[in-house]
Amino acid sequence: MEKNHSSGEWEKMKNEINELMIEGRDYAHQFGSASSQETREHLAKKILQSYHKSLTIMNYSGELDQVSQGGGSPKSDDSDQEPLVIKSSKKSMPRWSSKVRIAPGAGVDRTLDDGFSWRKYGQKDILGAKFPRGYYRCTYRKSQGCEATKQVQRSDENQMLLEISYRGIHSCSQAANVGTTMPIQNLEPNQTQEHGNLDMVKESVDNYNHQAHLHHNLHYPLSSTPNLENNNAYMLQMRDQNIEYFGSTSFSSDLGTSINYNFPASGSASHSASNSPSTVPLESPFESYDPNHPYGGFGGFYS
């Protein structure tokens, strides 16, 4: 009975990932022809969300497989079962940081308007730091299940700078109305503004290799788990082909990766025409994605 239940869950996950890959491919097509900075930022965020949701489902698939292999009493077909709830683990959530300059005498809470609604749920003193750290979560965490959080702390070196650490992407209704995850204010007069969600579009290949090691160790049985072995190429191609578009701020995850990207922001004279998105075609891995390819084991997605 347990095996039949697991097969049904695998099939559901396969369909969800298939839809996310098609969605990401469509956004990538639009990104290649987008002419404005604002549109590219919005599409980049959508592409990232497709990646993040796919990884979240696959991370959950490993946990589900471990539970099913761990034994336990079998359930009858007519027994009441809780609906499948897929929740992101902290290790799978993207994380990035920013420094924002504030006006002299301004309060911390009044200068944190980044387009999203946050609720402060805690504050504590940090050992060795001059200023306390504030903890915020999305206002819609309970009503819509949004897991986005951030931490805010004044810089010890410069009281006019706020160090902000973000974790997770907004999945609430706010995300559709806000074009970027956070505004990064200029720290230098001639510095071009860059937005945090663009810094996150690329994941380090080491991240996927680490995930592959974890998933392969689970030894999925082919009879009960779908295979995404062909999809790894899409992740790696996105990283290799588009790395020139993004960067100069760092992105890191709890898996231990930290990488830099170079994004040629519009209006910056320091970037040559050869680096401009208008002259360099975007070849997205989503373009070659086949939604009808065969499936086998989830571990193959990272192999």
UniProtKB/Swiss-Prot annotation:
Keywords: DNA-binding, Nucleus, Transcription, Transcription regulation. One of its GO terms (molecular function) is DNA-binding transcription factor activity. Pfam families: WRKY. GO terms for biological process: leaf senescence; response to hydrogen peroxide; response to ozone; response to salicylic acid. Signal peptide: none annotated. It is found in: Nucleus. Residues 107-175 bind DNA. SMART domains: WRKY (SM00774). One of its GO terms (cellular component) is cytoplasm. Residues 266-278 have a biased composition (Low complexity). Induction: By salicylic acid (SA). The keyword Transcription regulation applies. Residues 65-92, 266-291 are annotated as: Disordered. Belongs to the WRKY group III family. Transcription factor. Interacts specifically with the W box (5'-(T)TGAC[CT]-3'), a frequently occurring elicitor-responsive cis-acting element. Interacts with WRKY53, WRKY54 and WRKY70. This is Probable WRKY transcription factor 30. It comes from Arabidopsis thaliana.
